[in-house]
A protein has these predicted regions:
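P-loop NTPase motor module signature
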Residues: 1-479, 483, 553-557, 561-562, ...
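Short conserved micro-motifs at the rims of enzyme active sites and ligand-binding pockets
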Residues: 152-153, 246, 359, 404-406, ...
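Short, isolated positions in well-ordered beta-strands
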Residues: 232, 630, 848-850
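Acidic, serine/threonine- and proline-rich low-complexity intrinsically disordered segments
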Residues: 459, 494-621, 626-629, 642-840, ...
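Short, surface-exposed, low-complexity cationic segments
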Residues: 635-657, 855-896, 903, 907
């Protein structure tokens, strides 16, 4: 494929810093494979393209082997040679992706330092809100998410000759999605694009197949280059927390953080060198840092390292220790594989990690703290063995370690896929079909994400909407970006951007209170610099989008009565003249604006407090519109607020309430407007003792706003309530509430026997089946009974009485259950019911004796009619209880159900007590009867006990002794 460029770049100078670095590289293990890499990465000269087809390659290398440092310059040098053979084309850039912003900046600085340059020259970087690159940049380090947006804007990646996907073993959602789209673009548009995937631990086979198949018509596998590691001996020390667990029902216990800090102090005493501590999140990092700074020995510096810190603080943590001093670097998993922390000889691992999760049952997505995988734990430990013998202190037991998963769960299998679904819709493959995935996105999670996009007005049956395309182009999450565009016409672009930045700048809200965070950053406190930079970036993006995208027709109509947003319950301030996106003359201050933006971003998380405000220092619990339980951190100032707009949560590993990590107070009216799509009114009929009561409920999703009495329930409502009660109490208990008389029990047993032996269309009589089909047989009977004046509204009769507003008494005892069951009889087979399972059988005496069919179901029906489906038709047989004298001369045992079932005869004494049980009369007369006769003739001398029962006449009463 031949491409033309707007202008040619200047050829590299005579003294090429990249070539100089490769001529004298640092002593790193990757140097051993550089010749092989150069050979593998040289494009195929046999390709039709004038520069040859781009290479694809998978590189596996342990952390610390130098792959991020030396592979990008090697590839840039290879491409320079290629372009020298094709002078009509200027060399393009090598773009290197990193999973995190901090890693991208650090990698670029490290490489630029080796080249003897400042960042922004030969080597640059670009992350969200910051870019240092220029026209001479040949290697650019970016985050996967940023390259994903570039690829969506320009699928050909103009000006890029190679992409290196670094740390792909971390399996971030952006990284997996980027790999799928890059291979798709390469196959269709850019066969000359070189792709390299670099991994520390991932099984490379799947990657090799994906990259090997990214050329049109190719079905091979990409070559694999393995870099040997040079880890020094590593000692393991197990430091479990004793009786204190690593995880409690509400996250990481403070007692465990105390244990981690104590383990660090122990390591400082027992070992030499710097200490690297791994904790699951920024909150835990700051907690342990504060503990250690007050207890660390003289000459020890304690430094935090996480993504929320300013770049200067991150750089300080990554710098070598000053002479004569030791460092303790307390980090999240950012230092796990993609960063180099020099001087580390000791690792203290909390063995915990924080990962994104989609909780389908609770309709929530958020971060959850889990035990670290063994693969990640090994990587953490390896940080101690790069410069010499090291040691890892693991804050768990060997049993816990053995139970740890082998590898972390890929985000694509566990996280919310709404953002990924929007990217796929913009790419033109909403279902992801045809893309090469390391792991395909789960169908259910992707379907839920696509439904969410439709609700947000970002995608539909015809693909991505203009609004969805605008949202995808904004440097923020899907919901936050949409909230920015939706609220800008009301708040103004600047105020909306400032409020949205409180949600997206990765700042910690004190006590989960976004309004407190707003006051903090507005007053120049912690995080103010990051917030201002984020706000400026969002404002610029919002104004660009406003010029290209008309208003969102799906957004809440806040401005229907003028440029007023819902009253969130906070104060207002005057604004200047309207700006380009329609800033009104009155709008909320920052504290009110963040409530509006948060409620617009996550309306399903708007929540109302359960009960009164808690006592000081206690947790407040809330119920959300989506029905999920939420809780504030203990002592949060937000606990006084009845309503909250919740923007972020941390999930617990159990089923407890999710922890609110970002929220703002909200007035009830604002909550109703922001979550108006969930506002409903309904009537329901409920049981209260023996009385049925109708309620009118006004609800905001799962939140009940008001409950008022309704009119007395009509017959249909009564029937629905009875059916609901049967199901709600469980099939067996619910059916037991019905008045099962002998006729109903018998009919049910007869039908159960037919279903067992003849199958369909004879109905299943099990508890579960009857409950499932209750609308067919039970509801009509209840409706009919409730419609009878005496059956439901009689003043004092057995049907009950109507009394109390919105209620009526309904007496189930009047229900004819047998008649109700007949509604299930199949037609025309119903006419054969008495033939197949007769109620009575005529015996030789002429008596019509009732058959006991309940015995055929093992007596399980009992007095309640409850049938165990596992026993139905198998625990016994129908019983015919008849006196011996009425059966004289009867040779053949009666059979029913087309001869399939023999009736079990209970032969009775004159006192109607069983003297024999048989289903073989012939054998009984020959073998059993003589003994019965011998025992009974003296006890009942007035009754016939003939020696020859075959020929004796059957009799109902007493007879002369024979």
């Amino acid at each position: 494929m031949t491409r033309t460029r707007p202008q040619d770049r200047t050829q590299p100078p005579q003294t090429d810093p990249i070539r100089a670095l490769l001529a004298s590289p640092p002593d790193l293990p990757v140097v051993e494979v550089l010749p092989e890499l150069r050979e593998r990465l040289s494009p195929d000269p046999s390709a039709s393209d004038d520069a040859g087809a781009g290479a694809c390659l998978v590189l596996t290398a342990p952390p610390g082997t130098g792959k991020t440092t030396l592979v990008p310059p090697l590839l840039a040098d290879v491409l320079t040679d290629v372009r020298a053979d094709a002078p009509q084309r200027a060399p393009g850039r090598v773009v290197v992706t990193q999973p995190r912003r901090i890693a991208a900046r650090a990698a670029a600085r490290r490489l630029a330092d080796l080249l003897g340059e400042e960042v922004g020259g030969t080597v640059g970087y670009a992350v969200r809100g910051e870019r240092r690159a220029g026209p001479d940049t040949r290697i650019e380090v970016v985050t996967a998410g940023l390259l994903l947006r570039r690829l969506q804007r320009d699928p050909e990646l103009s000006g890029v000759d190679a992409v290196i996907l670094d740390e792909v073993h971390e399996r971030s959602l952006d990284s997996d999605l980027l790999l799928a789209l890059l291979t798709d673009a390469r196959a269709a548009l850019r066969e000359d694009l070189t792709l390299v995937a670099m991994s520390a631990t991932l099984d490379a086979d799947r990657l090799r197949r994906i990259l090997g198949g990214s050329s049109e018509g190719s079905s091979g596998v990409a070559p694999l280059v393995e870099v040997p590691g040079r880890l020094h001996p590593l000692e393991e020390v197990w430091a479990p927390p004793g009786h204190t667990g690593r995880l409690g029902p509400r996250g990481v216990p403070r007692e465990f953080l105390t244990h981690v800090a104590a383990t660090v102090e122990r390591a400082l005493t027992e070992r030499s060198g710097d200490v690297l501590v791994f904790l699951p999140g920024a909150r835990e990092v700051d907690d342990v840092v504060s503990r250690l700074r007050g207890a660390a020995p003289e000459g020890v510096d304690v430094l935090p390292l996480h993504g929320r810190l300013p770049a200067s603080a991150q750089d300080a943590a990554l710098a070598p220790s000053p002479a004569g001093r030791r460092r303790v670097v307390v980090s999240t998993n950012v230092a796990e594989s993609s960063l180099t922390v020099p001087g580390v000889r000791v690792v203290v691992d909390s063995t915990l990690a924080r990962e994104p999760r989609l909780d389908v049952a609770r309709s929530m997505s958020g971060l959850v703290t889990v035990g670290v995988s063994r693969a990640a734990g090994v990587q953490r430990a390896g940080r101690a063995g790069r410069e010499g013998p090291g040691v890892v202190y693991r804050c768990c037991s060997t049993t816990d370690w053995a139970r740890s998963p082998l590898a972390p769960t890929p985000e694509i299998l566990s996280a919310d896929l709404t953002g990924a679904a929007l990217e796929l819709a913009v790419w033109g493959v909403p279902d992801g079909a045809g893309l090469a995935w390391v792991d395909e996105p789960p169908a259910a999670a992707l379907a839920a994400a696509r439904e969410a996009l439709e609700r947000l007005g970002l995608a539909g049956a015809d693909g991505v909407t203009p609004l969805g395309r605008a949202v995808a182009g904004l440097p923020a999450g899907v919901r936050e970006a949409r909230a920015l565009l939706a609220t800008a016409p009301v708040l103004g672009a600047r105020r909306a951007a400032r409020a949205t930045a409180l949600l997206t700048a990765d700042l910690r809200a004190p006590g989960g209170d976004l309004t407190a965070l707003a006051r903090q950053v507005r007053g120049g406190g912690a995080g103010s610099g990051a917030w201002k930079a984020e706000a400026r970036r969002l404002e610029q993006a919002c104004r660009r989008a406003a010029l290209e995208q008309p208003g969102d027709p799906e957004a809440p109509d806040f401005a229907s009565g003028g440029p007023q947003a819902p009253d969130t319950g906070r104060g207002r301030e005057e604004t200047g003249s309207p700006d380009a996106v329609g800033e009104g003359t009155r709008a909320h201050d920052l504290e009110s604006a963040v409530a509006l933006v948060a409620g617009t971003a996550q309306p399903q998380w708007i929540a109302r407090r359960r009960g009164p405000a808690p006592q000081a220092g206690k947790e407040a619990h809330y119920a959300s519109v989506a029905g999920t339980g939420l809780r504030l951190p203990a002592g949060s100032a937000l606990a006084e607020s009845e309503w909250l707009a919740v923007a972020g949560v941390d999930l617990t590993s159990g089923r407890g309430d999710a922890l609110i990590r970002a929220a703002a107070p909200l007035a009830e009216q604002a909550a109703l407007e922001l979550a108006g799509a969930w506002l409903t009114e309904e009537e329901r009929t409920v049981w209260e003792g023996g009385r049925l009561r109708t309620e009118r409920l006004r609800r905001l999703g799962a939140i009940t706003l008001t409950t008022t009495p309704g009119p007395p329930p009509g017959p249909t409502a009564v029937a629905e309530a009875v059916v609901a009660r049967v199901r709600a109490e469980g099939a067996d208990a619910g059916l037991a509430a019905l008045p099962w008389d002998e006729e109903a029990l018998g009919l049910r047993a007869r039908l159960a026997l037919l279903h067992e032996h003849l199958g369909e269309p004879w109905p299943d009589m099990s508890d579960a089946a009857l409950a499932e089909r209750a609308e067919e047989w039970l509801a009509p009977a209840v409706t009919s009974l409730a419609g009878q004046a005496g059956g439901a509204n009689g003043a004092n009769g057995p049907g009950g009485s109507a009394s109390g507003q919105g209620s009526r008494r309904f007496n189930l005892e009047r229900l004819d259950v047998a008649q109700a069951l007949r509604a299930l009889l199949p037609w025309p087979q119903a006419s054969r019911l008495d033939e197949l399972v007769p109620e009575r059988i005529e015996v030789p005496s002429g008596s019509q004796v009732r058959v006991d069919y309940t015995a055929a179901i093992g007596g399980a029906a009992g007095a309640t009619g409850s049938v165990d489906p596992a026993e139905a038709g198998r625990a016994g047989r129908p019983v015919l209880a008849v006196r011996v004298q009425e059966c004289f001369g009867w040779a053949a045992t009666p059979r029913i159900v087309e001869g399939r079932v023999a009736v079990l005869l209970h032969l009775l004494s004159p006192a109607r007590r069983p003297v024999a049980v048989t289903d073989d009369l012939s054998s009984f007369w020959e073998q059993g009867y003589p003994q019965v006769r011998a025992e009974m003739r003296g006890r009942y001398p007035k009754h016939a006990w003939p020696e020859d029962p075959w020929n004796a006449p059957a009799t109902r009463g007493t007879g002369r002794r024979r």
